[in-house]
């Protein structure tokens, strides 16, 4: 729970910086934050390197500076670059992706968006994704964005997550529920 509080703390710090920026710099900041997020998500080894105890903090700072050197071109990106340095200095870089996800959720809330993750063992057809998007838009009264994430462990069906809510329509979820009911002597 303490790590979750730290994640929220750092995400709130990013959000506070974003709120202080003018419109142009908000766009640059958001775009750069997404670029960093996807770069690190797609190259997770980088997170492990920065989180490693083998490399000194000074070396990690040099690595971050070299990789994200272009970020220093605008004031909003200087904030992001310094934010990465703070995470490194505080030995919390391992949670960078979770921090960015929390930050993006705060932006979505600010802009009346709901971001949902649709987990399935296969790519869901666009028509079905649009139906899901429409249903959640009606249910929540918000504009909806979604991401279809492939999770082969689900076997079939899908699991939809947003915020702390989970709608599990997967075969794996049904099997897990039956298993739980049997273990707890509940009717199936």
From Swiss-Prot:
Keywords: ATP synthesis, Cell membrane, CF(1), Hydrogen ion transport, Ion transport, Membrane, Transport. It is found in: Cell membrane. It is a peripheral membrane protein. Pfam families: OSCP. Its main location: membrane. GO terms for molecular function: proton-transporting ATP synthase activity, rotational mechanism. One of its GO terms (cellular component) is proton-transporting ATP synthase complex. InterPro entries: ATP_synth_OSCP/delta_N_sf (IPR026015), ATPase_OSCP/dsu (IPR000711). NCBIfam families: ATP_synt_delta (TIGR01145). Belongs to the ATPase delta chain family. F(1)F(0) ATP synthase produces ATP from ADP in the presence of a proton or sodium gradient. F-type ATPases consist of two structural domains, F(1) containing the extramembraneous catalytic core and F(0) containing the membrane proton channel, linked together by a central stalk and a peripheral stalk. During catalysis, ATP synthesis in the catalytic domain of F(1) is coupled via a rotary mechanism of the central stalk subunits to proton translocation. This protein is part of the stalk that links CF(0) to CF(1). It either transmits conformational changes from CF(0) to CF(1) or is implicated in proton conduction. F-type ATPases have 2 components, F(1) - the catalytic core - and F(0) - the membrane proton channel. F(1) has five subunits: alpha(3), beta(3), gamma(1), delta(1), epsilon(1). F(0) has three main subunits: a(1), b(2) and c(10-14). The alpha and beta chains form an alternating ring which encloses part of the gamma chain. F(1) is attached to F(0) by a central stalk formed by the gamma and epsilon chains, while a peripheral stalk is formed by the delta and b chains. This is ATP synthase subunit delta. It comes from Malacoplasma penetrans (strain HF-2) (Mycoplasma penetrans).
